[in-house]
Amino acid sequence: AYRIAMNFGSQAQNPFLMTLDGIKKINLHTDGLGQGVLLKGYGSEGHDSGHLNYADIGKRIGGVEDFKTLIEKAKKYGAHLGIHVNASETYPESKYFNEKILRKNPDGSYSYGWNWLDQGINIDTAYDLAHGRLARWEDLKKKLGEGLDFIYVDVWGNGQSGDNGAWATHVLAKEINKQGWRFAIEWGHGGEYDSTFQHWAADLTYGGYTNKGINSAITRFIRNHQKDSWVGDYRSY
């Protein structure tokens, strides 16, 4: 069972040790049912802040020490932890925010992304690939060590950062897999070859039916045991 522990807007609603407490409670109430917990807003000031600085562990929610404690103690309760990141946008507070990586429209204006807090600006993912993206994953691994299970890459696949096609996605997934982490993604159709979990496929009531997942019976027959990528049996479809 997947669920989310979210921090947002500098409010620290779910500090790392509170998330651990929740894991213990759910383990008790479900008689040891396994858990997949996505930490949404693990860094900077919470969700959708500080993007591209993956190793910036949120201080308000416990910092690196508490995060490592969560990772270590969650194992006892059958919980697999992942983090929610973005490889398509950046924000002014990130130390990796710079003019060269920002994507522009044909008229020279910036290509803007999400804007519910600071205004996000889309990046040029090809430039990012060639200028330090892998090193940022490695920095995160150095801080956390072993034990993190997966990386969920938000919005990748919609093209807002340029080429999000098959080759670019394979490279991104390999960078993540190299650190010992599974690769997960948002769209039901996104990263089918590499991703083991797609949000829109698994969240039955979220989004429209055209993005709900992979409906190939042949592909599912071959790979059903490897991933959660398939269109759900949900009557509204």
Language-model features: locations:
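Aromatic-lined carbohydrate-binding/catalytic grooves of carbohydrate-active enzymes
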Residues: 2-159
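Alpha-helix-loop-beta-strand connector modules within alpha/beta enzyme cores
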Residues: 70, 74, 172-181
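Glycan-recognition surfaces
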Residues: 92, 96-135, 181-237
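Conserved protein kinase catalytic core
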Residues: 160-161, 192
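Charged helix-capping and loop-helix junction motifs
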Residues: 165-171
